[in-house]
Amino acid sequence: MNIRRTTALLAAVALASSLAGCASESPAAEGSTTTIEFGLPTNMGANNSPMAVAEAMGYFAEEGLEVDIVVTGDSTSIVQGIDSGSLDIGSTPPEPILQAMTKGSDLQLVYNYIRKQTGSLAVLADSPIQSLDDFRGAVIGQASLGTSNMLLSEGILASAGLTPDVDYSHLAVGTGAAALQALKGGQVDALSLWDTEYAAFEAQGTPLRYFTTDEVASLFSTTYFTSAEYAADNAATIEGFGRAMAKATLFTATNPEAALRIMYDEYPDTLVAGNSIDDQLAIDLVALERRIELLTAGDPQASGTWGAYDESALKAWATFALDAGIIDSAVDAVAAAPGTFVEAYNDFDGDAVISEAKDWSAAE
């Protein structure tokens, strides 16, 4: 497989030393290949299946790109990797990006990937927690203590006047079966994860109840970002990457089962030991179909807005982050997302991609 995955549960300093010199400096010349070091905070799974599609269907290759996925395990390391130059493009919700901007990082949001919010707090259906006020004294399970979802949960609970480490605490529990067991076993009172994780838990027979605020529910989620310097020097590379991901997302939305089967082939370790492919598919389809609703909100194919940010949504994020105490000073999120590459992202034959998805078979 051409996507080379590196698991890096290290800080950006370690990333810089291990990957220094790998980052591309300019678009690939005719007939050559540009390598992108791409930071991903979570392991490959249904939520990231469009990445596998972009590789397997040749969408990256068509753009002269090879993508190295660097799995960091948290969002903070990705921001630090972009700052250090050890990563070219990163994937994370906006919270840690906005935090870094207040500390002087010159970052640019380049592709609005998940167009609606994925994160919320979740409890078991029979939990005594009935409102945000009831989280006083709670232990909240996080994928890690460097995840953007921890910041989001703190923002949600701030609306009820609750303060972390005073009124409630966090505990790293991972994701998947480990997180679910921590919740069911009483190690934590709630989880702060995301849509596909929750959908998989419910598909396996664990009903949940969710807590958020109207303000948070209206925000977009995962975004692709880079340094302002990389964006200025590598426009063609960013355009190609975004166009490939737009195609892959459209393919996935058209035929989610094909996207998952492609992912299983490209990443065999996404199959849970003891599960048949059909059993795994039944769980992952529920999760992916929930994610597709967020990936395609506003019908970006019809509107030609793959990767685009709405100015009001950017302002809403900056306001929420400041009001919730995620950042301690105002940032200009609109200026950080100039939309320079959106026209190029949408410059492809959508009908051809849809046909390709509908016609896909496992024999390909």
Residue ranges of predicted features:
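C-terminal motif of bacterial Sec signal peptides marking the signal peptidase cleavage site
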Residues: 17-21
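Soluble non-cytosolic domains of exported or imported proteins
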Residues: 45, 72-76, 91, 147-151, ...
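Secondary-structure end/capping motifs
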Residues: 234-328
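Conserved C-terminal helix/tail region of periplasmic/extracytoplasmic solute-binding proteins
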Residues: 311-364
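Bacterial N-terminal signal peptides that target proteins for export
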Residues: 1-10
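Bacterial signal peptide processing site
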Residues: 23-25
